[in-house]
Regions:
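PRPP-associated nucleotide enzymes
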Residues: 1-147, 151
């Protein structure tokens, strides 16, 4: 027999929407008129990404997408992360904002930041809807900045 666990609402949709708007304002203030590439980590972050970039006021915003895989055969997670889909644009010399739904172990974000850093991104910053610090295996920090999702 399957027992259904009682679910508890952690954040209401209104609270999430307000935080997304606040993050967008933070990002706008931080970058100003600087060109920015916002990279959505598919598939999980797509709705958060859409809401976030719609709330941003930047006119110098380029959108791109990546998809990462950290699973070997079956469903067990591995420490080996690979691209299933890479960005299409050249990020050399550009500010890059990675938008992720949940940062858990940090392995995927560490992989992505190292890849983008090696390609010469001017700066790398992370906007995450949920940051599960308690499950972190590796340190995930913005490059040349402080975290935008610290609230």
């Amino acid at each position: 027999m399957n027992a259904i666990k009682e679910r508890k609402i952690v954040y209401t949709s209104g609270q999430i929407a307000e935080r997304v708007r606040a993050m967008a304002a933070e990002i706008d203030a931080f970058y100003g008129d600087e060109p920015l590439v916002a990279v959505c980590v598919l598939k999980g972050a797509v709705f958060f990404f859409t809401d976030l970039v719609r709330a941003m006021r930047s006119e110098n915003l380029e959108l791109d997408f990546v998809r990462l895989s950290s699973y070997g055969k079956g469903t067990s997670s591995s420490r080996h992360v690979v691209f299933s889909k890479d960005v299409d644009c050249d990020i050399t010399g550009k500010h890059v904002l990675i938008v992720e739904d949940v940062v858990d172990s940090g392995l995927s974000m560490q992989f992505l930041m190292r890849q983008f850093e090696a390609r010469g991104a001017r700066s790398l910053r992370l906007a995450a809807l949920v940051d599960k610090n308690e499950r972190r295996e590796v340190d995930v920090r913005d490059r040349k900045s402080t975290r935008l999702n610290s609230s």
